[in-house]
């Protein structure tokens, strides 16, 4: 990173790629949200994560993180559920935490994506977490942080899509590194894919389009 309050060079590059390719948003570390928002000047939505990567921060801490992020210019907040509480079956805790963050973010016109970290949950827990997220007001349910034991799977995307109404969108993330995986994820019900290989995937898409195969 550069000294002082400058954004990390890598994060500036991510913003440049996001604007170049018309990405839905770019995900930036919370400490650089303000600089990123100023840098893109409204040309690109800024996202950040809270409770990353295991969701074990207290609800109050997560709410502060969300409030701080939105105040600094974040348009989207990706929150990790408290995985331990979900596994324990403490559904009231999980839903209440999601609702508090959704209420806070929505009051400031930001959207919330709820990260399940599906690799640690049973199918029944994944389904239930999707239902709790929708009941709490989430805009998206999202598979993974990318830091778990496994990322996005097609089966998980299908399950999640079937577990929420059309009012909630599904995002796949973790291990999506090529165009074929993006297309498979979309076919399985994902409205968005979280990727770090944007330039590579777009190059594949452009080449395939020129060949008349897309």
Give residue ranges: language-model regions.
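Alpha-helix-loop-beta-strand connector modules within alpha/beta enzyme cores
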Residues: 30-54, 89-113, 120, 135, ...
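Active-site cofactor/substrate anionic-group-binding motifs, chiefly glycine-
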Residues: 20-76
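Single conserved hydrophobic/aromatic residue that forms the stacking wall/gate
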Residues: 1-4, 8-9
């Amino acid at each position: 990173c550069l000294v002082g309050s400058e954004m990390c060079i890598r994060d500036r590059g991510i913003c440049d790629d996001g604007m170049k390719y018309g990405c839905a948003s770019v995900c930036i570390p919370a400490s650089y949200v303000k600089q990123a928002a100023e840098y893109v000047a409204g040309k690109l939505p800024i996202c950040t994560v809270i409770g990353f990567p295991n969701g074990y921060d207290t609800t109050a801490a997560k709410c502060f993180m969300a409030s701080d992020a939105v105040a600094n210019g974040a348009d989207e907040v990706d929150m990790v559920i408290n995985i331990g509480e979900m596994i324990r079956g403490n559904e009231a805790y999980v839903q209440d935490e999601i609702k508090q963050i959704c209420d806070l973010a929505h009051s400031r016109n930001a959207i919330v994506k709820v990260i399940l970290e599906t690799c640690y949950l049973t199918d029944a827990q994944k389904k239930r977490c999707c239902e709790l997220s929708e009941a709490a007001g989430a805009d998206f349910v999202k598979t993974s942080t990318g830091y778990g034991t496994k990322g996005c799977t097609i089966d998980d995307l299908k399950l999640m899509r079937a577990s929420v109404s059309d009012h909630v969108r599904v995002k796949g993330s973790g291990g999506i590194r090529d165009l074929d995986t993006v297309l498979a994820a979309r076919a399985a019900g994902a409205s968005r894919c979280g990727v770090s290989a944007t330039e590579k995937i777009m190059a594949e898409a452009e080449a395939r389009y020129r060949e008349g195969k897309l």
